[in-house]
Amino acid sequence: MNREELFDVTVIGGGPAGLYSAFYSGLREMKTKIIEFQPQLGGKIHVYPEKMIWDIGGLLPVTGEKLIEQLVQQGLTFQPEVVLNTKIESIIRNKDGIFTLKTSTGEEHFSKTVIVATGSGILNPQKLSIEGAERFEVSNLNYTVKSLKRFKNKTVIISGGGNSAIDWANELEPIAKKVYLTYRKEELSGHEAQVKQLMNSSAECFFNTSITTLIAGDNHEAIEYVELTNHETGEVSQLAIDEVIINHGYERDITLLENSELDVAIIDNYYIAGNANSESSVDGLYAAGDILKHEGKLHLIAGAFQDAGNAVNKAKQFIQPDASEYGMVSSHNEVFKKRNRELIKQMMK
């Protein structure tokens, strides 16, 4: 291992928690690396790029896409090394206390400390279990909604009864020509206010009903009709549609901690059992964002920022025990003086 290969902090995950960890780690003058499974930074927010996010203090309502842009810009402030399209499969520790992060392709990354910021894990949408459905994914079978404009003046059917399905039904109802929602159970399981909004809208809901067949048009490239089956009566009906959205939840890949030799305490078969300081049961390994669980945990993007700051502060003291417990606030920090002067010049133009 070359000295250049060893990092002070390696952040696994490039979502909000990971990006803020990288920013704050740079602020505390640590050599930092981000490793992200996806081909881009931003995390799960990519699933809802056009949704408005209201609950970040001091920040006016912002779209997911804009928030990603700002988070990435901030996260790269101190030029951390960024590794994309890379899956960390295990973490081990040598006799000198250095962590080795092994990837699915056999590469190794070396770090003095690790911050796990993998959110809800590597998420893959649960696909529609109908033979041949995958061929329509290039036309009008959707597992995410990346652009509301796509559904303008279209007849849309959404399959699912959780928060995501209900949210998209409410978002699309004033935009689409017609919105249908089909759910295999008798009652929707989303937030009460969202369910009430949906039931009072023009959207039409089919309960105890599932999509059982996709019927293509004459060109065989896109779905033209869906066949719905009522599980109570056995009745089968056809519905003409333009777009199909499937919200059946996500399959979670949790192999990272399962494959690791470290004895990291886990809660609910996935989450890292930590504390309010973002510490795990393993010295030098920290957690931030949704992957971290402890009493009083705030499961919001805003909470992820606090987790990240706590994790970085603990990492700094782990590496340098006599370091300050907290980093200096940005308004008085020397590293921003030059940047502040440049920003003030721009403001004065």
Swiss-Prot record:
Q: Which reaction does it catalyse?
A: 2 reduced [2Fe-2S]-[ferredoxin] + NADP(+) + H(+) = 2 oxidized [2Fe-2S]-[ferredoxin] + NADPH
Cofactor binding, per record: Binds 1 FAD per subunit.
EC number(s) of the enzyme?
A: 1.18.1.2
Instruction: Fetch the Gene3D superfamilies from UniProt.
Output: FAD/NAD(P)-binding domain (3.50.50.60)
Q: Which cofactor does it need?
A: FAD
Q: Which Pfam families match?
A: Pyr_redox_2 (PF07992)
- Superkingdom as given in the UniProt entry: Bacteria
Record keywords: FAD, Flavoprotein, NADP, Oxidoreductase
Task: Tell me the InterPro entries matching this sequence.
Answer: FAD/NAD-bd_sf (IPR036188), FAD/NAD-binding_dom (IPR023753), Fd--NADP_Rdtase_type_2 (IPR022890), Ferredoxin-NADP_redctase_2 (IPR050097)
Q: Write out the residues that bind FAD.
A: E36, K44, Y48, I88, L123, D290, S331
MF annotations from Gene Ontology: ferredoxin-NADP+ reductase activity; flavin adenine dinucleotide binding; NADP binding
Q: Which proteins does it associate with, and in what oligomeric form?
A: Homodimer.
Family per record: Belongs to the ferredoxin--NADP reductase type 2 family.
Entry protein name: Ferredoxin--NADP reductase 1
Q: Which organism is it from?
A: Bacillus anthracis
Kindly list the organism's lineage.
Answer: Bacteria, Bacillati, Bacillota, Bacilli, Bacillales
